[in-house]
Amino acid sequence: MKTQFTVLLITLVLFQMLSQSEAILSYLWNGIKSIFGKRGLSDLSDLDELFDGEITKADLDLLREIM
């Protein structure tokens, strides 16, 4: 009885690992396809607006408040 219970638990754990890894791999594959697809490469120029190298007075005030 203990052996059957142990085999059942191990089987359940392995099935859970398989289902989670399949979901993670499909999520990663969709992300890779969206990055390297035709539309994905043209949309990367939109990210340039997020990285502004200038520090404004408001940024300095926020940093002072944090410290």
From Swiss-Prot:
Transmembrane segments: none
Paired cysteines (S-S): none
Phenylalanine amide modifications at: F36
Record's keyword annotation contains Signal: yes
Domain of life: Eukaryota
Any one biological process term the GO annotation gives: defense response to bacterium
UniProt KW Cell inner membrane keyword: no
Organs and tissues of expression: Expressed by the venom gland.
Residues of the signal peptide: 1-23
Propeptide: 40-67
GO CC terms in record: extracellular region; membrane; other organism cell membrane
Keywords for the protein's UniProt record, in alphabetical order: Amidation, Antibiotic, Antimicrobial, Antiviral protein, Cleavage on pair of basic residues, Membrane, Secreted, Signal, Target cell membrane, Target membrane
Primary location recorded for the protein, binned into one broad class: secreted
Location(s) in or outside the cell: Secreted; Target cell membrane
Job description of the protein: Amphipathic peptide with antibacterial activities. Shows antiviral activities against the herpes simplex virus type-1. It potently inhibits the initial infection by provoking the rupture of viral envelop and the dissociation of proteins from the virions (EC(50) is 0.41 uM). It also effectively inhibits viral attachment (EC(50) is 5.73 uM), viral entry (EC(50) is 4.32 uM) and viral proliferation after infection (EC(50) is 8.41 uM). Morever, it enters mammalian tested cells (Vero) and reduces the intracellular infectivity.
Family that this chain belongs to: Belongs to the non-disulfide-bridged peptide (NDBP) superfamily. Short antimicrobial peptide (group 4) family.
Name listed for the protein in its UniProt record: Peptide Hp1239
The organism of origin for this protein: Heterometrus petersii (Asian forest scorpion)
